Each structure stands twice: as C-alpha cells, then as structure tokens.
A protein has these predicted regions:
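Glycine-rich phosphate/pyrophosphate-handling loop used in enzymes and phosphotransfer proteins
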Residues: 1-242
Length: 242
C-alpha cells in the first residue's frame, strides 16, 4: 500500500474494484444492446423464450372434450372434438400467457406454439385457424395467431386467418367465464376471400381455453363454410363455468 503526500494510505484495491465494476456495467449494457431480449424463465440473453425452458413449464394430461372440458373421448358428447392444451392456467404457464398478451412479446408466442406442438396427438389438419383478435383489442398482434405460427413451424401445417368477429365485443366483457359461455349466435364470420385452395380440415388455435364457448362458436362458423374441425389447441386450460 502506497502513501499520498499527507502520509495517508492509498488502497489501490478499491480503485481496481471500482474500475472492474464500471467495465462490467459497460459490458452488460453492450450485451443488452446486442441482445435486447431474454428468456423469461432462465434469463438467457438473446432468447425470446428457450424452447427447452417452455417445454419444462408444460404438463399435458391428454385431451379434453371441448363441450364439457372433461376427459376425451366423452360419453356425454360423442360428437365433440378433442381439445389439447399444454398446461393448466396457473403458475409459470399463466405468467407466460400474461407476458405474451400484456408484455407485447409476440416472438414469445411463437416459441410457446412450438413447445405446444409436442402435446398434440391427432391426425394433422390441412390448416391451423387461430381465434381472431377482438375488434376492440388494443394489442398490436394476435396472441393466438403467434401460437399458431409456432405450431405451424413444428407441424408443417399452414396458418389460415379466415375468421373475424361478427359482433363488437369489448375484451373486458369476456374476462369472466360466465360471459364467455354466453357468446351470441353467429359471433364469428368466415372470410371466404382468405380461404386457401385444397383446405378441408382444420384445427382451431387459442391462447387460453376457459369454457370452450369461443372455440365452439368458431367451429360452428367453420363447419357452415364446409370445413371439418378435427380438434383445437390452447397453451393453457382454465376451466370455467359452462
């Protein structure tokens, strides 16, 4: 340890430590400029969501009946199609949904869809049809479409945005399961100009399934347009009152 002109000790170690902290801060800032996103689970820079991390959040337990959300096949609803989901709507899975919807992380939805693909086990459809964004939604992207895009990458099945809302329903009106189960008849319309040639069978994609009413409403509209719905899928399942 040296001395200054007045004989006081000079602790060089503090200077070195301070310099190191400054350099570390600069390096961290530079890294985040290059990679401004990070996996919400492990924190890995440059990743919008590690596929392995998201798969670790999932806990699939087989399909449910889209009519009653009980085990599929269902004795009560023999004509119902299966609904597949990645996890129940709680814990880390719920947090990912909230980050996707309210954190404006569209790329995260694609990773979530890719992870969800491993939970599906029925014949591949000709196309994936996402539930459309509500007319009054303030979001810049459709979270259901992002999940469908991820599924498309893994399954090799195209996304077909052929549905739109036929009625103006404010998103806040659908936050309660009771309201979801009371969707008006003809809530959706089929945009025939967006139908792709050769498409006969489809799978409906959504971010969260609460009562199944939204998916069932979409399925009725698709069926009227001559499309067969093989099943549906959502990242999470939040059972609500039918």
């Amino acid at each position: 340890m040296g001395k200054d002109r007045q004989g006081r000790g000079i602790k060089k170690g503090r200077c070195v430590a301070s310099d190191f902290s400054v350099m570390a801060g600069i390096a961290s800032l530079f890294w985040h400029v290059l990679f401004p996103v990070a996996c919400p689970i492990c924190g890995r820079a440059g990743s919008t969501g590690c596929l392995g991390c998201i798969k670790g959040v999932l806990s699939p337990s087989g399909p449910v009946c889209i009519e009653c959300l009980n085990c599929y096949p269902c004795d009560r609803h023999t004509l119902a199609f299966p609904h597949y989901f990645g996890a129940t709507h709680k814990g880390p899975a719920r947090q990912l949904i909230h980050l996707l919807k309210y954190g404006h992380h569209g790329a995260l939805g694609i990773s979530m869809g890719r992870a969800l693909a491993a939970c599906l086990s029925f014949p591949l459809p000709d196309a994936l049809v996402p539930i459309p964004l509500h007319n009054e939604s303030p979001r810049f992207f459709n979270q259901s479409e992002k999940i469908a895009q991820g599924l498309s990458l893994e399954l090799g099945v195209p996304v077909m945005n052929c549905l739109s809302w036929n009625v103006r329903i404010h998103p806040r009106a659908l936050t309660k399961s009771y309201a979801r189960s009371k969707l008006p008849e003809g809530a959706f319309k089929l945009d025939e100009c967006r139908l792709k040639a050769g498409i006969r069978t489809v799978m409906i994609c959504d971010d969260v399934c609460t009562t199944g009413a939204t998916i069932l409403g979409a399925a009725k509209t698709l069926a009227k347009g001559g499309l067969q719905v093989l099943g549906s899928a959502s990242f999470t399942l939040a059972k609500g009152k039918k």
